[in-house]
């Protein structure tokens, strides 16, 4: 969406002269994935993770540019990375749709710019935006707009320039995830829940288009902290207990179920709120939203035992764990050297790298 500069916007190139690297940046880590084109399609190359110290990035804002530059410079040297596609923090992005009447419309970008302040709480001169035409008829255009504060994107551009890594594209994390886990040209509507360490992204995609995204300050670390406090053990022991028992009612330690259930129910309520809002509110013009076919889970903590079953029963809808290889053509011939559990943490990086293979 945001191509290699905070001032220029171009589509992702449909050709590729070498490997495609996706770089997923968060407060805790930088994950990278390399995808390689070969005669049978696309195959997984290198992948890995680098820790990001606390305080370097907070709520999507880079607080320590020099430290992040050091991490990226080291990654470039160790992995010989030259260019990447990079995720942008959803906490700092505004996503909305507007309808533009064709009568008198001369410049789409200018028309959007004039209406920005009706949709975001930031002056138009202090932001960067890009847009996508969703559909149109004889009289109007339906346009989706993504907006990010200029100072945020400028910091990301600067750290990559200083580390010597070229950026093909800056893209919303949720859009990258959708590219990885939703089959190409799938017309249905899905809710995607990215359950991470410190936060959870909730998105809705319809006909391959990201329609909505929101971030909740609730992640797997909170569940671990609850176990730590309830059982008076250290964090590492609590994390092991969470992974071993999860939400299994039949586990040998039933106390963990009730402890975790309180935390997970908070997440369930947030998911349900967005689920109901989508189904009870109509599109502009009075048309009903298409129904959500199922909820798809990804992110490192979506591996929690019993989570899909709990959400499915409590929300009375189908819930399943994502398949991040659904759009990688060689997976049936050769299983990627990455476990399914591990792959759920790499959904964003894989989706970013896939962007260079879009027609």
For each feature predicted by the language model, list its residue ranges.
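Hydrophobic/aromatic-enriched cytosolic interaction surfaces used to assemble or bind macromolecules
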Residues: 1-359
């Amino acid at each position: 969406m945001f191509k290699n500069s905070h001032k220029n916007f171009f589509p992702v190139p449909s050709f590729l002269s070498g490997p495609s690297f996706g770089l997923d940046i968060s407060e805790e880590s930088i994950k990278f994935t390399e995808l390689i084109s070969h005669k049978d399609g696309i195959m997984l190359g290198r992948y890995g993770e680098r820790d990001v110290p606390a305080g370097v990035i907070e709520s999507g804002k880079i607080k320590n540019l020099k430290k992040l530059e050091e991490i990226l410079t080291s990654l470039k040297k160790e992995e010989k990375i030259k260019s990447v596609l990079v995720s942008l923090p959803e906490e700092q992005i505004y996503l909305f749709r507007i309808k533009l009447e064709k009568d008198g419309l001369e410049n789409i970008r200018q028309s959007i710019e004039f209406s920005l302040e009706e949709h975001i709480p930031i002056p138009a001169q202090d932001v960067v935006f890009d847009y996508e035409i969703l559909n149109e008829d004889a009289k109007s255009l339906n346009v989706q707009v993504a907006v990010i504060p200029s100072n945020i994107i400028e910091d990301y551009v600067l750290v990559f320039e200083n580390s010597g890594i070229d950026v093909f594209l800056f893209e919303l994390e949720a859009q990258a995830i959708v590219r990885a886990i939703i089959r190409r040209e799938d017309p249905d509507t899905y809710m995607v829940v990215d359950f991470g360490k410190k936060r959870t992204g909730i998105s809705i995609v319809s006909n391959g288009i990201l329609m909505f995204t929101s971030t909740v300050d609730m992640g797997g670390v909170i569940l671990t902290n609850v176990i730590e406090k309830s059982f008076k053990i250290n964090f590492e022991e609590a994390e092991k207990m969470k992974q071993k028992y999860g939400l299994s009612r039949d586990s040998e330690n039933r106390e963990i179920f009730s402890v975790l259930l309180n935390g997970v129910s908070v997440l369930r309520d947030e998911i349900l709120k967005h689920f109901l809002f989508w189904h009870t509110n109509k599109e502009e013009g009075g048309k009903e939203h298409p129904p959500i076919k199922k909820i798809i889970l990804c992110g490192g903590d979506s591996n929690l035992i019993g989570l899909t079953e709990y959400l499915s029963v409590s929300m009375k809808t189908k819930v399943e764990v994502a398949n991040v290889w659904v759009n990688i053509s060689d997976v049936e011939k050769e299983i990627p050297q990455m476990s399914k559990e591990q792959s759920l943490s790499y959904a964003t990086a894989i989706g970013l790298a896939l962007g260079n293979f879009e027609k």
